[in-house]
Structures are given as structure tokens and as C-alpha cells.
Amino acid sequence: MQSIRLASCALVLLLAAACASTTLVSAWQNPAYTGGPIKKVMIIGLGATPGGRAEFENDMADALADAGVIGVSSSGYFADARELTREAVRAWVIRDGYQGVLVTRLESVQQTQTVQAPQYTDLWGYWGYYGVAVTPGYVVDDTKLRITSDLFTAPSGQVVYTAELTSVDPPSRQKLIHQLVDLLVTDLTKRGLLPPKP
């Protein structure tokens, strides 16, 4: 019986891990934009930690390079996120000839706790002796992240694309970032805002 319970717990944990996902919830493209694919982008990540910011920006730069786009991490210009003022970013964008600025922000982190009630099953062969077998209840902790990403043209600052993404129980920061980058680059390419992959 103990081995069955342990196996059941392991299965629950495995299924929970399998359900962890990052999804593109919604996206909007400015119909007034007619500038074609953007080929040089400054990448700005506004996350919970400086390490997360740099990791996202560098991963996005690598993914853009694979698509034939010059993507540059803002961390190289502004090590401290507090330096990311409108005026400072605009000056760098104009000076270095960027066509776009991609700003991705961690908007919220929501943590919930769900109590799964015990499951009761008839214990065949022991009915009337032990009564019923009880599978103990357990607590499930969920973490949901909401992320937004906006692409602006430079130097005008026109919004050409905005997306909302969610991630439920990401297994690690690295995997979360990889999923975010893949979803964003795929959608931007599909919409013609980035050039098709060579």
C-alpha cells in the first residue's frame, strides 16, 4: 500500500511538471505600421533580477541573430536598469541607428495554493472490517507569471506590436526565458515584423 501511495505521489508530481507551460495569450499588431521587417533592435528586459534581465536580453539577441537581425542587449549600455530613462534610450537608439526597441517586462507574479481533498475508495474484500481506504489529501502550489512585450519603432517610438504571455510553474528561469524568446521571435516573424529566417 505504501508503494502504491508513493507511486501515486510521483505520478502527480510528474503530471504537474508536464503541465508547466508558457503561452502567448494575446498579441496586437499596429495596422498603421508599413515599415516592413525590423533588422536592428535594442533589447530591454525588465525582470525581477539583474541576472534575469541580462540572461533574457542575451538569449533574445542570439535568437535574433539566427533570424538575420542585429539584436543588442541594453545591459551593454545600461548596466543599472535605473539608467534606462526615456532620454538616455532615445539618444543611444538615434546614435547607433536602431530601427526598433523591444521592451519585455515581468508584470506580475501570482502565487496560489490549492488543497486537494482526500479521495475515498471502497476497499473491496475489507468492507465492514476496515471500512474505506483513504488516499490522503495534498497541497498544490502554483506560480503564475504575467509578462508583456512591446516593440517600438525607432526613433519615432511608435508601438507596432504588443503581446501578453503567461507562464505557470516554470521549471527554471533558463527554460522560461527560452520559451519566451521562442514564442516572441516566432510570432514577430510570422507577422512580418522580423525578416524570415535565412
Where are these predicted regions, by residue range?
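Bacterial N-terminal signal peptides that target proteins for export
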Residues: M1-A10
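Surface-exposed flexible segments
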Residues: Q2, R53-A63, Q113-P118, D122
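A structural "domain/chain start" motif
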Residues: C19-A81, A88-Y98, T166, L193-P198
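Surface-exposed short loop/turn segments
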Residues: L84-L151, P155
